């Protein structure tokens, strides 16, 4: 299953990497691997694209999942129940309890990440689980980790996740697993190195009821990639992932498309223009110098207050090279590209 899904997704990976380089550099580790803590903005010469994505993400968070006001209500489908005052009071109390549960959880932090990935890559995924205190826990997954499929209705019905886990944490995360000698050896000798775990959730074709967690509607399997060891087999009553997709260009594409994809040509052009304009401005502010080949005693000192000696009687002088650059034209063209990028992220509408 994993190998098939990986082969289907490979054409997207270079596209996602390029998007992350320009729009979301902190997540630019899809086909390129970065050391934790290193700089990620080396290709960015203009921050318009990253700022536009941040602004739209914050706006979606404020409009759809506001932190200071209720962002959902519960209603009955049955019209008769909707006219019952006691039933409505009960439903309102349920909504308040749900809001309290969301407030206690890490939902706001993770949904903000979800909006960023959705607007940049067009697809994002959030895992929903409960902890020992029966509170909800949310985790937004990096686009590089997920492999999805959809059913005949166009809904995502399976997700396979490939993630890293420290060897020393394998026993704690999978206490009931029968670990082979190879994994135990890695835990003992290389506890701080990463193991690769594959977690797949997919529909159970033959559910047999809820008498145990292996007979539920959704199968959940955790496999150690290096050894192929099945670490855990369980299930879910409901699909535990939320997988929004911004837009789909055609019915044969499973992964979504994003406003960042529309803005990518303008963003790449703007970065190239900015790099050129910076060089042109540097040449005007600190221009190349034309020095006569005779009459001056080297070295030439261009620092403030520097003394330069030349032979008396000569009319030769050190002069700046006139490069004839037109900075206003370059700046005007950059503004055109900035406007196009902002329009893709609806910045004008958000700022009014």
Sequence positions of predicted segments:
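Flexible loop/turn segments at secondary-structure boundaries
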Residues: 133-136, 205-209, 228-230, 351-352
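A generic structural signal for short, solvent-exposed coil/turn residues
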Residues: 118, 138-140, 189-190, 213, ...
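Extended, helix-rich architectural segments
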Residues: 1-193
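Secondary-structure transition/turn motif
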Residues: 141-145, 160-165, 202, 222-228, ...
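Extended, non-transmembrane interaction/recognition domains
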Residues: 202, 211-215
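Membrane-proximal cytosolic interface modules of multi-pass membrane proteins
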Residues: 194-199, 203-204
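Extended, charged amphipathic alpha-helical segments
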Residues: 217-352
């Amino acid at each position: 299953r994993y190998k098939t899904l990986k082969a289907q997704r490979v054409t997207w990976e270079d596209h996602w990497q390029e998007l992350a380089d320009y729009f979301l550099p902190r997540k630019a580790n899809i086909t390129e691997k970065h050391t934790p803590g290193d700089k990620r903005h080396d290709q960015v010469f203009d921050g318009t694209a990253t700022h536009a994505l941040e602004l739209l993400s914050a706006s979606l968070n404020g409009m759809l999942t506001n932190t200071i006001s209720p962002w959902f209500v519960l209603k009955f489908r049955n019209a008769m129940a909707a006219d019952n005052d006691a039933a409505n009071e009960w439903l309102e109390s349920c909504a308040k309890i749900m809001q309290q549960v969301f407030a206690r959880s890490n939902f706001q932090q993770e949904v903000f990440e979800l909006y960023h990935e959705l607007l940049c890559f067009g697809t994002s995924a959030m895992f929903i689980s409960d902890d020992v205190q029966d509170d909800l826990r949310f985790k937004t997954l990096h686009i590089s980790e997920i492999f999805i499929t959809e059913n005949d209705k166009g809904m995502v019905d399976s997700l396979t996740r490939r993630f890293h886990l420290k060897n020393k944490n394998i026993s704690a995360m999978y206490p009931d697993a029968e670990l082979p000698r190879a994994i135990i050896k890695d835990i003992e000798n290389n506890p701080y190195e990463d193991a690769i775990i594959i977690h797949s959730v997919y529909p159970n074709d033959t559910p047999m009821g809820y008498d145990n967690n292996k007979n539920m509607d959704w199968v959940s399997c955790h496999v150690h990639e290096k050894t192929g060891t099945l670490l855990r087999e369980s299930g879910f009553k409901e699909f535990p992932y939320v997988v929004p997709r911004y837009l789909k260009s055609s019915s044969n594409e499973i992964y979504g498309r994003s406003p960042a994809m529309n803005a990518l040509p303008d963003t790449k052009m703007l970065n190239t223009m900015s790099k050129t304009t910076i060089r042109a401005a540097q040449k005007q502010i600190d221009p190349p110098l034309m020095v006569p080949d005779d009459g001056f005693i080297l070295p030439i000192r261009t620092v403030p207050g520097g003394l330069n000696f030349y032979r008396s009687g000569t009319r030769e002088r050190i002069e700046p090279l006139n490069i004839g650059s037109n900075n206003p034209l370059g700046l005007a063209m950059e503004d055109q590209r900035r406007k196009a990028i902002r329009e893709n992220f609806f910045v004008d509408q958000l700022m009014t």
